[in-house]
Amino acid sequence: MKTNVLPAENSAQNTKATNAVLGKDVMEAVWADMALTELPSWVSDVPPNWGTPARGKLSANNWRVICTVHLPITLIRLWGGDDTPKPWRDFLENFMDLVCAAQIANLRSISKEEIKLYEHYIFRYVTNFKSLYKHSKVKPIHHAALHYGDILRGFGPAHTHGGAFYERYIYSMQSMNHNMKFGM
């Protein structure tokens, strides 16, 4: 049975005022779907109360699982129907462009064709972001994401040059003795 959770008619004005797309009803639908979703053993569980003040901050891996697994499951169910009003269908398509780009950017191996596909999705995401979220500003991370195809072309898959690599490098540098002082 399809449940179509869309904001009330006057919520469009509230959405612009609060900069929020996911309201309480949508969040409750996500949490309900999470309780019914069986994840493979290699996918980390996320806190069931994410998105609430009581929960606090989430790890990058929590956000990855939420945005690439849980939100797509619920948002496609809620906003993916032919009868979904245009703005909400557009929000879904824009979010799915971001999900596709993120999935491609995090592949363990990557081809030239996949890099072009990444560039297609991220360009469409940023372009449509500007028209869908007129009240929001394009951030430096959006600009950086548009250049990430060049980074993938030059340095290969993200895991070879991602944060974990630099964390290990920084740790090894801090472990060395520099001028008789630790951590310099």
Predicted regions and their residues:
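A structural signal for the principal folded core domain
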Residues: 1-184
